[in-house]
């Protein structure tokens, strides 16, 4: 039976641990130059409604490493962008491909793709969640901290799609989660309620120093995401005191790791000093997107 991953909650704690173990193994094999052609003659269709650097390159490289093939399907270049229904697109692509990855504006799009396709569908970013990002993040945390339990994960900034997945993922693996957002930018109540139902321990505050106090992980993201450009001026004012800088790091544990899903707006949500400093694991985190997604593709498509 096919499995889709549209939310981090589509994976159990056990499945997350299995994926991270697989990702670390695949990372070692890649560094050693070992062949991993596990998906020879298999094809992954990649539907993009939003521009991307890390998502596109990492998924394409993943399929190349596996001896398979990836097809970049920009929504402007296929009929889905000219009025063909998502339902018909899903059914058609199911006859050609072995998996679909979709980076979309609306979460409803990936839900429909999953419902009407007979092949696995991966959410590579929607307006609600970004499970692939969190798998790469959790791999990075495991590499640096070797555990999830007894860790405090502090999110500073917008309670956006990545924050939603981080909140829910932390609840699944047993990390304490603290989010600091300006009033009105908190994660939506449905995500907080879901985290609670998963046994999550979390706090929501509008004071970054409260969230970051004794944190093991500090995470930030852009203040103005794709689609929010009309609010740029307003957001830059409201988020001005939510910058991850040296002063804020001083409130966390000395061995805190700093994370960012990228792309970053240096000088806004994070300073150069922190991004390029000794606590930053941001570029290892970016690399781990590749390995974590390889593990996920392999689980769903092998």
From Swiss-Prot:
GO-annotated cellular components: cytoplasm
Name this polypeptide is given: Ornithine carbamoyltransferase
Family: Belongs to the aspartate/ornithine carbamoyltransferase superfamily. OTCase family.
One MF annotation (Gene Ontology) recorded for this entry: ornithine carbamoyltransferase activity
Superkingdom, natural source: Archaea
EC id: 2.1.3.3
PROSITE patterns tied to this protein: CARBAMOYLTRANSFERASE (PS00097)
Reactions this protein catalyses: carbamoyl phosphate + L-ornithine = L-citrulline + phosphate + H(+)
Pathways involved: Amino-acid biosynthesis; L-arginine biosynthesis; L-arginine from L-ornithine and carbamoyl phosphate: step 1/3
Binding-site residues for carbamoyl phosphate, renumbered to this chain: 52-55, 79, 103, 130-133, 261-262, 289
Subcellular location: Cytoplasm
Any Pfam family hit: OTCace
One annotated GO biological process: L-arginine biosynthetic process
Free-text function comment from the UniProt entry: Reversibly catalyzes the transfer of the carbamoyl group from carbamoyl phosphate (CP) to the N(epsilon) atom of ornithine (ORN) to produce L-citrulline.
Protein keywords: Amino-acid biosynthesis, Arginine biosynthesis, Cytoplasm, Transferase
Binding site for L-ornithine: 161, 221, 225-226
InterPro entries found in the cross-reference section: Asp/Orn_carbamoyltranf_P-bd, Asp/Orn_carbamoylTrfase, Asp/Orn_carbamoylTrfase_sf, Asp_carbamoyltransf_Asp/Orn-bd, Orn/put_carbamltrans, OTCase_ArgI
Enzyme type, top EC level: transferase
Name of the gene: argF
Transmembrane segments: none
